[in-house]
Amino acid sequence: MKRGKRILEKLIIFYLVIRKGEKMLGQASGRSNICNASARAKARKASLIDPTRMRQLLQTGPESIGASIGELGYRNEMDIYSARMSGADAVEAALFHNLDNDLSDVMNFCQGPLKSIVAIYVERFAYEKAKTVLRAVNGGCSDELIESQILPSENPMNAVWLDIVRTTETLHEAANSMAGTPWGKELAKLDDSDATLEEMEDALDRQYYSHALKVSKGRDSNPQLVKYIRTEIDHRNIINQFRELRQNISTEKRLQMVIPGGRLSKTVMSQVSQANSNKSILEALRRSNTFDETGFDEAILESDALGTLDPIATLLNHRRHDLLRSFSYLNPVSVFPVIYYIERKVLEIQNLRLLVRGKTIGLTAEVLEAHMDF
């Protein structure tokens, strides 16, 4: 019981570090440091790996790819994991550790209400780690496997999550151990005895986007940020509908799983939930004047041919990235350069992870480049 309380205390402290650290870093004055933060974010973005350098990495052999990545800003984290891991595992652990460090740095140089807005994009990684813990516990992964591979103990930001893993045996015990945090409070609303992993993940998504919309309408925000988040909700709902259809989930269940707050109306999403084919989903979406159908016919055809939703997901991702890039350029002194930097940093991590894993299994440079997002 005492250990359980300590874990809860750590989780609450972890959450407060993300959400309320601004009180120590400028919110007391009630002012955001938008000019300084946007300038620093732009400087960081300029230091990211550009497409030319990424394509050069594509030509690197699998035996030297780790060293090459280390020289591009990941050396400190690579050194941490090289003693215990090797190859793609070491590189991947280093990449995620570097991302955690980078997100912490970004939060530290944001102040005032700006910090709360940026926290929206940092918090999503805490939500993802909560999902990771729930999946690992539900899947019966051993503590040793989780600590060595999934959430490496070398990363201090994994400590609170590893405590949950070590002290819980079931999915519901893991969910209960998160009480006191926004994600834990949302999980507590579910039927403790019957809630499935899928229902818990859906609940976390709803909580995240509900909070994101609330914060995005506050001080130092703008209508374009609200539009971006609502677009992201739409994209999540669209890809979920295609996925749920493939899984033969009932119409009622599909409608229940829709995340509220998007630009697509409830009526349209109700019609989408009743669709019984990819084509009919698209037809229902076309009834909304906020839906851009450009490229969807081709993406669905490719998806059907390949038996995967990757073409549709890629189309939506590119749309969202283009929208964020546009908002960042149109609003050079705002929250957008900071958010755009975070997005580009995450894409760099994803590209490097794909590169390392792909090289390990012998994928060609052409195949890897086709799946990268520059």
What are the residue ranges of the model-derived segments?
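N-terminal domain-start signal
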Residues: L16-F374
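N-terminal amphipathic/basic-hydrophobic helices that include classical n-h-c signal peptides
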Residues: M1-K23
